[in-house]
Amino acid sequence: GFVIPYGDCPLDQDMLGERVYMDILNRARKYVHIMTPYLILDGETETALKFAAERGVEVVLLLPGIPDKEVPYALAKTHYPSLLASGIQIYEYTPGFVHAKVFVSDDREAVVGTINLDYRSLYHHFECATYLYKAGCIPQIEDDFQATLAKCRQVTKETVRRESFKVKMTGYLMKAIAPLM
């Protein structure tokens, strides 16, 4: 297999972190499992996630159930209704704050690094990650994802409906400035 470290720089136009994530989403056949502390999506990334699920790929998002920052937490929840409607499974980690940034797909490829699934990481920050293709450690990355998933609660349409008014309003009001977050 291959293990390829890479860096992403906001000073060029390459957007390597986003391209790697989009490539994994677009080529997935069986599953894409994603663990990220922040979920503030642009239209292109949200469309890629939804398209993967709609073509039969199991897309699972694992996010914090306990936030470190209220506004990004509320913003993430604004995406839940449309993601759930497309068949994406969303889980929230209940024991604490999950800070891992992991993509793993089809027992074939994975990314582990510093790149969150949000505007700041994808467009504004210096980030780094490691892309793994057919590397021997990919099953262990998936095992870790599954072990973490076992400590999560699943988000449903009912969960979204019962979310507090404060969280809903915070998320939708802040959506206008989401690209800055």
Where are these regions (language model features)?
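Charged, low-complexity intrinsically disordered terminal segments
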Residues: 1-181
